[in-house]
Every structure is written in structure tokens, then in C-alpha cells.
């Protein structure tokens, strides 16, 4: 709380009349709202230089400091739902009369994706926050589909995680170029969800009913989070098991799609236990358009189950400790009889938070997990009436890691953050080759990766209307015990590869200037990086008739970026508008580069391109039109192109220069909107999403056409805590392009479901 107050802006507050002088060495006063009502439990901090003292207002809004030897200082007052007030005080003045103004919705939202709580309107980073009500009002029931309402969010392909192969579920922000590996870090309560071997994300691991909110922070974040945060951070905040509560949602939809999500907790004194689980299955749909289908085209579908148990121990107001065990499993059919995959994950997490008073606050996170991915690939005849098994893979991986963070407020104008992290990953791919249905060769590739990082951040209010943030992080990573088959045709054996290491320094400087009580300007510059995953280094894959080779010589991607924008609030703080211009250059981006093309097979390899540049503008608008109607929307224009590329001389005729071409999978325009009508017993909401043209390949020959989709949901409360609802995704039933492999694949048809939601206790 003190850290939050130290960062809060002196937006409002007034000192009314000064009556008789307070006794020497004493500061007294009363805190009220604009109606004159007393504000109870407001936090009042007096500061002078490095000296600070804290009091809390009583039921009548009064506070008293005694034993004050300073002649002058600043009294900062804060309370939930109100703007923070700064009041100058001098010895001999009368009791203070402090009036607090209500905070806008944006001012009440605290963002934690930057490792410390900062109010949304005081954050120089572009952040979109989806609250619990926002998530409840979304027709989508997979987290990645919910996040598509955030401008700039995209996966490797447009396909939803309901049916997409998990290795295509890497996330991209701001047009940095999606691939199997994410270019943004996804966290759940501070623990990474990115796959340790491949960098993609299993979006179903966090049960939907256990999610309290989601923060999407765009822009390079390696200065705090290291390699995986090249383009930003997605922070999933789980509901803590700090009260007796039950939240259950059960639904059934077409495509034979049942879904059950549960979150429950029980508090017993300082101890509490939380349970969360989700079960889902769907028969899916045929992804190939009817005019192109053959005998082997079958349903793409999936089923998954996830569950976790959390045990938590609180220590009064000093902190807590918790342990969480989780399991996850899924299986998928990928559109033909022979193409399938399945995954199992088990993980154990530990965490603790401790307030050491004047020594600061400490946070610990540690985790260990193991997993296994099984997958099969086939070659498909040109008439799509037959297929042959070409390869099966088993990919085991293990990871362990920890992070320790310290933060402390210095006076009322400065906040310090520092921490260290380490992760250790071990993974390999074991492959069996087939020809004419018979096994022909075995091969293996993999290795170990260790990452170390240390970071520090200084957030300082250099003037009442200026907030400066300076941060930096040093990372060093090492790949060792690596091996790969010297040639896919070699029957058995693997060649050892030399150890490799790299280091990188990620600085960031950001500033926020409050022009008026309603308008702020922001600017920042940063560098970020992403080390190649074990998957990119050592595992190839096949999608349709496109085979992508691994490359053990890949080096880390490096990003240099800058952004500037403005935040404006108005209409009695019921309207917020945020606009940002961004520019990002990536040197050595890892891309799937086409090597050869034949009618039956396209061969690509992961390579470090020369460089790409992504620049554009993003806009976010939200408004509370009335007590019942909320409107919001976002738009992003992104111009992402290849700016340098070295052609392989041996393939110059087949592999022309890519300079000037668009980065694959990135549309030029994205737009979304949401409209919500809510009353005590009814909720109506619609969400629309538009995506412009984009290309599925590096040579810009496989076009995915623009699309628009509309979702809607309605719910009715039968009694407090008991709701019935209907939700429809793709209300217009438009089968838009999602991939070309090179055969066109289209997205899901309309999905309608109905269900029951039970909520007892606060979510």
C-alpha cells in the first residue's frame, strides 16, 4: 500500500479553512468527501525528507500525528475509490481539513505487470486491463479468444486454441511477428506459462473461473522479465483463496461442446485452501473448405482437463506463503486421421510475500515441472484422398526456476525495485521416421538451457507532475549438452554440438508528465531480447505439406524500441482515451524462411533474418455512458516489414530477397469494440472484431483475407449468485481464412452455448 501511495499523483484535494493552531509537535485534521461525509480508514502519510509517519483515520475521519519535530512537510492522503491528495503543512497551522474527490475508473485500476502496483493512469507503459466483469461479459470461453479484443494481440495463426495445434499458439503484440514461440511473456500469479521447450502457450492451464483479471502490457519488457518478454507481458491474476467462496460455470454448445469450470476456496483462520479445475471437449469442425476437401479431411477437435490445489498461510499483515500443485492434459485431432497430438504437464509452485517494514517488501517464487508432447505428421496427396505417416515425435521437457524480488518506498517520491531470477530447462525431441507406413529411421535432438538475470528499477517523482522510471536488467544464458542428428536420413545416432552462451543488457527509460488533472503525456525507450528456444534450435515440424527445419545456429533476437503517447480522461472521469505511437526494430529475428518449393512439399528453415521494423499507432477508448451502459474499443495500425535480409547464395534463384515484404501473420489494421448493458438482474453484451489482410508466409504469396466477426452474450440472474446465460461466438457464421499450408484452412462456424453460473462469495 505504501508503495502505491508513493507513486500516486497529486491530482486533487483541498485545504479548507485553518482554525486555531495545533499544539506544538502535533499534526491533526479530518478527511471527508465532497459531500462532507467522513472518510474512514483513509491512509495519511506525513513526510519530510527521509522521515515518514503514517496514521489511519477513525470513524469520524480524524487523524493525529504526535511528536513531530519538523517545521514543514507534506501530508499525503489516500483512500480506496478516491484520488490521492497532497497537502503542504507548516508548524503552527491549524487542523487540516482534507477533501477527497472520487477517483475515475482508470485511477482505481492498479497494474502489476510491471512487478509493482502502479495506477493505470500513472503508467507510462501501454496497458489494457480486462477485469472480472469484462471477462464475464465476453462470449468467448477460451482465454486467447477473450484476449483478441486487445488491439495488437495475435497468435501464430488466426485459429482459436479450441482447435489449433499447441505449437502454433505463440503470442505476438504490436506486430513483432508471431511464430510457434511467443514474443511476449505470459504469467499466472508470477509463474511463467510459456512452454519451456517451445515458447508457445497452453491457454487452458488457468481455469477460467479462477481468473480475477488479465493485464496486457505492450512494449519491450526485458528490462524486468528477461528473454520471453521481448514484446510485452500478459499477466493473469488468479483469485486468491482468502475467503469462503464458490464459482462454478457449466455450459453446453453445438459441436458437442460441454465445458465445466470451477473455483472454490475455504478459509480457516490464517490458513486457506483453494481448488480450481476445468473440463472441456468439442467435436470441432472440418477446417478445409468444402470445395477443397478430400477423403482424408476430418474434424479438428480437442479435449482437455486442468486442475490445481493451493494451500495458503497468512501472517497477519506481514505477508503470506503458498504452495500450488497443478496438472494439465489435452489431446487433439488436427484434421486428418493420422495427424494428432497430446500433452501432459505437472507442476509444483511455491510463493511467498513478506513485508519487512522499513527494510522493504520481499517476494519469492519457485517452480518445478515436467511435461511431455506427443505428435504425429503426415504427407497428404494433392487430391487430399490419401495420406502417409511421415514422422512421430515425443518431446519430454523439465524446468525448474526461481525469482526473488525486493521493493521499498523511499520517502513519498521514490520507489525502488530489484530482483534476481534463474531458470533451468532440459528438453529433447525423439523422432521416428516413416516411409510407406514403415519405420525407417530414428533421430533425436535437444539440450539444456540455463538463464540468469538480475534487474533493478527506480521510480521517482522528480516533480509534482513528472514521474520518471529508469530500469535495467542483465541476462546471461547458456546452451549446453546439446545434440542433433547429423542428417535426418541417418538411422541412429546424434552429433554433439558445442556449448553456446550469450549475454544482454536491457535498459528502459520512461517518463510521464501530467499536463492537467485530465491529460498526461508518456514517452519511453527500451531494448529487449529473446533467446531461441530449444524447439527452434533442435526440433523440426510439419504442417500440412509445409516442413520447417530446425537450426542449431540461431542467435538471440534483439529489439530496440521507442513509444510516445497521451492519456486523457473526461466527462466527470467516466471517459478514458489512450493513444500511443510505437516503433520497434528487431535485429536477427527468427523467421521461417522458404528454401524450396515443389507441388507436394514446401521446405522452410528457421533462420535469423537481418532485421524487421514494426511501427504504428494504437488507440484505446472506454466510457461509462450511464450507470447501465459501458462502451469500449480499440484500434491498431501496424506497418511491419523486413528491412534487411541476406540471401543464401546457394538458393538465390529459389529464395529471393525478402526486403520490403510484410512480416508474416501481421495485419495492417485491427479494430475491436465492446458494448455492455448491465442491470441488477440482466446483462447484454456484444463484441466485434476486425482484422485486415495478412500473409501466411515469408514471401507474401499466401494471402489470408480480412475478416469481421461478431460475438454476443446475455445472462439473467435468477437470484443472487445464480445466473443463466447464452453466448454466441461468430454470430454472423463467417468462415474466414485462418491458415494456408498451402491449402486454405478456415475458422470455426457459429458456436452457441447455454449454461449456468453460480457464484457465492466474492470472485
Q: What are the roles of these predicted feature ranges?
A:
Residues 24, 32-37, 43-44, 78-82, ...:
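Short, acidic, small-residue-rich periplasmic hinge/interaction motif at the N-terminus
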Amino acid at each position: 500500500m505504501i508503495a502505491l501511495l508513493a507513486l500516486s499523483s497529486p491530482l486533487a484535494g483541498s485545504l479548507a479553512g485553518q482554525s486555531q493552531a495545533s499544539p506544538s509537535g502535533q499534526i491533526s485534521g479530518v478527511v471527508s468527501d465532497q459531500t462532507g461525509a467522513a472518510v474512514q480508514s483513509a491512509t495519511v502519510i506525513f513526510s519530510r525528507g527521509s522521515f515518514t509517519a503514517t496514521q489511519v483515520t477513525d470513524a469520524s475521519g480524524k487523524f493525529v500525528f504526535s511528536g513531530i519535530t519538523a517545521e514543514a512537510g507534506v501530508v499525503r492522503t489516500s483512500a480506496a475509490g478516491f484520488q490521492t491528495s497532497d497537502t503542504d503543512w507548516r508548524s503552527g497551522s491549524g487542523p487540516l481539513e482534507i477533501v477527497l474527490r472520487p477517483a475515475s475508473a482508470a485511477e482505481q485500476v492498479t497494474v502489476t505487470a510491471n512487478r509493482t502496483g502502479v495506477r493505470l493512469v500513472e503508467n507510462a507503459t501501454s496497458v489494457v486491463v480486462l477485469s472480472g466483469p469484462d471477462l464475464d461479459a465476453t462470449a468467448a470461453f477460451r482465454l486467447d479468444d477473450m484476449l483478441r479484443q486487445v488491439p495488437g494481440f495475435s497468435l501464430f495463426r488466426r485459429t482459436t486454441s479450441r482447435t489449433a495445434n499447441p505449437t502454433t499458439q505463440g503470442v505476438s503484440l504490436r506486430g513483432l511477428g508471431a511464430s510457434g514461440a511467443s514474443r511476449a511473456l505470459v504469467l499466472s500469479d508470477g509463474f511463467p506459462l510459456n512452454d519451456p521447450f517451445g515458447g508457445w502457450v497452453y491457454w487452458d492451464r488457468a481455469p477460467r473461473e479462477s481468473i480475477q483479471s488479465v493485464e496486457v502490457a505492450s512494449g519491450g519488457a526485458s528490462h524486468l522479465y528477461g528473454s520471453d518478454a521481448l514484446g510485452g507481458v500478459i499477466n493473469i491474476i488468479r483469485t486468491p483463496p482468502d475467503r469462503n467462496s464458490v464459482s462454478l460455470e457449466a455450459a453446453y454448445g453445438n459441436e458437442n461442446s460441454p465445458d465445466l469450470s470451477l473455483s472454490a476456496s475455504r478459509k480457516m483462520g490464517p490458513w486457506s485452501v483453494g481448488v480450481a479445475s476445468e473440463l472441456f471437449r468439442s467435436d470441432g469442425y472440418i477446417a478445409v473448405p468444402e470445395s477443397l476437401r478430400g477423403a482424408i479431411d476430418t474434424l479438428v477437435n480437442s479435449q482437455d482437463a486442468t486442475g490445481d490445489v493451493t494451500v495458503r498461510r497468512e501472517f497477519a499483515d506481514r505477508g503470506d506463503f503458498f504452495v500450488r500443485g497443478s496438472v494439465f492434459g489435452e489431446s487433439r485431432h488436427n484434421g486428418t486421421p493420422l495427424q494428432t497430438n497430446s500433452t501432459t504437464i505437472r507442476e509444483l509452485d511455491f510463493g511467498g510475500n513478506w513485508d519487512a517494514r522499513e527494510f522493504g517488501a520481499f517476494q519469492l517464487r519457485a517452480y518445478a515441472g515436467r511435461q511431455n508432447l506427443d505428435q504425429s505428421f503426415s504427407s497428404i496427396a494433392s487430391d487430399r484422398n490419401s495420406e502417409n505417416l511421415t514422422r512421430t515425435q515425443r518431446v519430454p521437457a523439465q524446468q525448474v526456476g526461481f525469482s526473488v524480488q525486493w521493493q521499498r518506498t523511499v520517502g513519498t517520491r521514490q520507489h525502488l525495485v530489484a530482483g534476481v531470477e534463474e531458470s533451468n530447462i532440459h528438453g529433447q525431441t525423439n523422432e521416428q521416421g516413416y516411409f510407406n507406413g514403415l519405420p525407417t529411421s530414428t533421430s533425436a535432438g535437444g539440450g539444456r538451457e540455463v538463464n540468469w538475470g538480475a534487474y533493478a528499477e527506480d521510480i521517482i517523482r522528480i516533480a509534482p507532475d513528472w514521474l520518471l522510471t529508469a530500469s535495467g536488467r542483465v541476462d546471461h544464458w547458456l546452451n549446453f549438452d546439446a545434440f542433433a542428428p547429423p542428417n535426418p536420413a541417418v538411422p541412429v545416432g546424434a552429433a554433439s554440438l558445442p556449448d553456446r552462451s550469450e549475454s544482454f543488457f536491457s535498459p528502459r527509460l520512461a517518463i510521464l508528465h501530467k499536463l492537467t488533472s485530465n491529460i498526461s503525456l508518456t514517452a519511453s525507450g527500451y531494448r529487449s531480447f529473446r533467446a531461441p528456444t530449444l524447439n527452434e534450435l533442435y526440433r523440426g515440424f510439419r504442417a500440412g505439406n509445409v516442413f520447417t527445419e530446425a537450426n542449431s545456429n540461431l542467435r538471440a533476437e534483439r529489439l530496440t524500441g521507442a513509444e510516445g503517447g497521451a492519456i486523457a480522461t473526461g466527462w466527470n472521469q467516466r471517459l478514458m482515451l489512450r493513444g500511443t505511437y510505437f516503433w520497434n526494430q528487431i535485429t536477427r529475428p527468427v523467421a521461417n524462411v522458404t528454401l524450396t518449393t515443389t507441388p507436394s512439399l514446401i521446405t522452410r528453415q528457421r533462420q535469423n533474418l537481418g532485421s524487421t521494423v514494426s511501427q504504428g499507432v494504437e488507440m484505446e477508448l472506454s466510457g461509462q455512458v450511464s450507470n447501465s451502459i459501458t462502451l469500449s474499443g480499440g484500434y491498431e495500425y501496424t506497418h511491419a516489414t523486413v528491412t534487411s535480409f541476406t540471401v543464401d547464395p546457394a538458393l538465390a534463384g529459389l529464395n529471393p530477397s525478402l526486403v520490403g515484404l510484410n512480416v508474416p501473420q501481421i495485419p495492417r489494421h485491427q479494430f475491436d469494440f465492446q458494448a455492455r448493458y448491465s442491470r441488477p438482474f440482466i446483462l447484454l453484451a456484444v463484441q466485434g472484431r476486425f482484422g485486415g489482410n495478412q500473409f501466411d508466409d515469408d514471401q507474401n504469396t499466401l494471402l489470408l483475407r480480412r475478416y469481421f466477426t461478431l460475438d454476443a452474450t446475455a445472462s439473467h440472474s435468477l437470484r443472487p449468485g445464480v445466473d443463466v446465460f447464452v453466448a454466441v461466438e461468430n454470430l454472423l457464421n463467417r468462415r474466414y481464412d485462418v491458415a494456408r499450408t498451402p491449402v486454405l484452412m478456415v475458422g470455426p462456424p457459429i458456436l452457441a452455448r447455454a449454461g449456468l453460473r453460480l457464484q457465492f462469495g466474492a470472485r
